């Protein structure tokens, strides 16, 4: 299903052949994910948001985040949300992408996930896309949280965190 969805989107799917459930966050799996990411030399990595009701989402987020921390190369790292309020919790975006022109393509790709009722997933995502679009001034948008290695103060932090003269 995932590879069929990738075909619809015109992207190359890369799977690590993990079981559907019960993957541990351990040194072996972190090394495997880190090696795979390093081998691809990506510009960005997009991973699940770790505060999620679904255990597989939390696991994949933890593995990707550990790989990001362990990486010897630098790449952009973003978290995405999955059905905010139902699965992803406490998600406060730092970045948005207007998906208005590709929403139909995303819908088609979700329909490939027959075992997960892709149409029902689409209906939940469509509400989320419209809400996120409203937040950023687009008809539909996806939201992301960007992690930054540069140790800079991010917009929105309280003023007390900016001052170093305490």
Give the role of each language-model region:
Residues 1-2:
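Generic hydrophobic, amphipathic alpha-helix propensity
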Residues 7, 11-14, 18-166:
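Metal-dependent de-N-acetylase/amidase catalytic core
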């Amino acid at each position: 299903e995932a590879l069929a969805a990738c075909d619809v989107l015109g992207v190359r799917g890369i799977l690590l052949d993990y079981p559907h459930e019960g993957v541990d966050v351990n040194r072996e799996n972190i090394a495997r994910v880190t090696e795979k990411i390093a081998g691809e030399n990506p510009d960005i990595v997009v991973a699940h948001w770790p505060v999620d009701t679904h255990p597989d989402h939390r696991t994949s987020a933890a593995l990707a985040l550990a790989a990001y921390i362990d990486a010897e190369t630098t790449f952009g790292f973003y978290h995405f949300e999955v059905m905010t309020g139902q699965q992803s919790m406490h998600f406060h975006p730092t970045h948005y992408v207007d998906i208005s022109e590709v929403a139909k393509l995303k819908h088609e790709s979700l329909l490939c996930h027959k075992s997960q009722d892709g149409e029902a997933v689409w209906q939940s995502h469509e509400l989320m896309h419209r809400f996120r679009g409203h937040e950023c001034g687009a008809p539909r948008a996806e939201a992301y949280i960007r992690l930054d290695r540069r140790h800079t103060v991010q917009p929105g932090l309280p003023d007390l965190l900016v001052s170093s003269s305490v």
